[in-house]
Regions:
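Catalytic and GAP-homology cores of small GTPase regulators
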Residues: 81-198
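Short linear, low-complexity motifs centered on an aromatic residue
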Residues: 1-5, 9-10, 14, 130-142, ...
């Protein structure tokens, strides 16, 4: 009787295990379908909103041309340029029926609209002083390149804690900064910097049992900025400060402060060691 009872229980346990395995497989399939549907929904939103943006911008062409004219006018102040862009963005969004839009769709709408608009005025906004700005960026780029040749992660100049050496040279963070020039809007550029710092924080956290502090992040970020040596870094900082600084919040603002501090530290090094 005991043997029969044991076999019966054993069969039941096997049945439960197989049922559990079957349910887990089904849950995985359902999750995969949900993710696929979400991607399809996001793609559909992007296509529809992109079409709406192109349609409404065609009607705003006169206003866009006026914006371009004011950006070319040397008497237009920097703060005024930022206000002009924001007013045109807000005015254009007001032309659309956005009451039925979700918060996610409204965010996407503004991002797409920003990309279209900033693409039209990018060089005027990014290099307000034309060749002078480009020359200044080029000189700094060359100086950082020389500095990078003899700089390693264990340099006393940076004083990076040895416990973080195992994750150097932080290639994923460098790769993010190298993409900076590919983006045209200040929002997209700051997101690029945000991802760079996030990569560093994640890698540093694997080297210790606590969350890395600003004192941990900054020296590594300095190293990453030097080694990536992204072009037009000074113009990037001024561009973001002009057109996006007031919209930053939370971690985004924190990482931006760290990035600017890293660049200032590099400029100090170069000034002390010309």
């Amino acid at each position: 009787m005991i043997e029969i009872d044991w076999k019966t229980r054993n069969f039941y346990i096997i049945y439960l295990l197989k049922s559990r395995q079957y349910l887990l497989q089904r849950l995985k399939q359902i999750d995969s379908v949900q993710q696929s549907l979400h991607k399809d929904h996001s793609s559909t939103d992007f296509i529809i909103i992109s079409f709406l943006v192109r349609s409404i911008l065609e009607k705003q062409e006169q206003n866009i041309q006026e914006l371009i004219r004011k950006f070319r006018d040397s008497t237009t102040l920097t703060d005024e340029k930022a206000s002009l862009v924001q007013r045109l963005l807000d005015h254009t969004i007001d032309q659309l029926q956005t009451k039925l839009f979700t918060d996610e769709q409204l965010t996407l709408l503004r991002q797409i609209l920003e990309r279209h608009l900033m693409n039209r005025i990018y060089l005027l906004a990014f290099y307000p002083n034309g060749d002078i700005d480009q020359l200044r960026d080029q000189i700094l780029h060359q100086q950082i390149n020389q500095l990078s040749l003899n700089l390693s992660h264990n340099s006393k100049l940076l004083n990076i804690p040895t416990k973080f050496f195992t994750t150097s040279p932080w290639p994923s963070a460098q790769a993010e900064l190298l993409l900076l020039s590919a983006y045209k809007t200040p929002r997209d550029k700051i997101q690029c910097i945000y991802r760079c710092c996030s990569h560093i924080m994640t890698l540093l956290s694997t080297s210790q049992n606590s969350i890395p502090s600003a004192d941990d992040l900054l020296p590594v970020l300095i190293f990453v900025v030097i080694k990536s040596n992204t072009r037009s870094i000074l113009s990037t900082i001024e561009y973001i400060n002009t057109f996006y600084l007031n919209e930053m919040t939370g971690e985004q603002s924190y990482y931006w402060t760290q990035f600017c501090s890293a660049v200032e530290f590099i400029k100090t090094i170069l000034h002390c060691n010309p």
